[in-house]
C-alpha cells in the first residue's frame, strides 16, 4: 500500500503542533475593612509559574486534494490549556501583610482567591499576546506542509500546498 494524504493523519500531526509558553509572575489580592474605628487591611501576593498551550482545534481542520494541489482549511490557533502549575506553589509562594487591629491572619479563603486571580491574570496575558497565536498557527502550518511534502516524496508527486480559512 502506497502512502496517501489523509485528513486523520493530518489531524494527528496537528495535535503535535502546539506552542507551550511558561509564565512566572505575581498576583496580588487586597482586602480592606473597618473594624470598630480602625481601618484594617490584608494584602497577599502569590508568586506562581504556569503553562499555556496554544494550537489548532484539529476537529476544524479540513483538506481537499485536486491533482497535485492540496488545499488545507485551518482555523486560527486558540488556547488549548492555560493553568497555574500547582507544583510551583509552596509556603514560600505566598507573601502576606496585615495592618490594623482585628485584621486577622491571611487564611485559606484569601489564598484561594489569590490563586484564582493568578489563573485569571495568566489567561488574560495569553489572550492578549497575538504573537503567540501567530507562532502556534505558523508552527501547525509548517508541520502540515512538511507532512504533505513527505507523502509526495514517498509516492513521487510534488504537491503544492495552499491555505484557506474556515
What are these regions (language model features)?
Residues 1-166:
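Domain-level marker for long, solvent-exposed, non-transmembrane regions
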Amino acid at each position: 500500500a502506497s502512502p496517501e494524504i489523509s485528513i486523520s493523519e493530518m489531524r494527528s500531526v496537528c495535535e503535535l503542533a502546539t506552542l507551550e509558553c511558561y509564565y512566572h509572575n505575581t498576583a496580588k489580592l487586597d482586602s480592606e475593612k473597618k473594624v470598630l474605628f480602625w481601618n484594617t487591611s490584608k494584602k497577599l501576593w502569590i508568586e506562581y509559574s504556569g503553562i499555556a498551550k496554544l494550537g489548532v482545534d484539529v476537529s476544524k481542520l479540513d483538506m481537499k486534494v485536486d491533482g497535485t494541489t492540496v488545499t488545507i482549511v485551518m482555523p486560527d490557533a486558540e488556547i488549548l490549556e492555560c493553568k497555574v502549575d500547582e507544583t510551583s506553589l509552596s509556603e514560600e509562594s505566598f507573601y502576606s501583610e496585615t495592618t490594623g487591629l482585628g485584621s486577622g491572619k491571611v487564611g485559606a479563603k484569601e489564598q484561594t482567591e489569590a490563586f484564582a486571580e493568578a489563573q485569571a491574570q495568566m489567561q488574560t496575558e495569553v489572550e492578549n499576546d497575538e504573537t503567540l497565536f501567530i507562532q502556534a498557527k505558523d508552527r501547525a502550518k509548517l508541520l502540515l506542509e512538511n507532512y504533505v511534502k513527505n507523502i509526495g516524496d514517498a509516492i513521487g508527486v510534488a504537491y503544492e500546498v495552499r491555505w484557506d480559512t474556515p
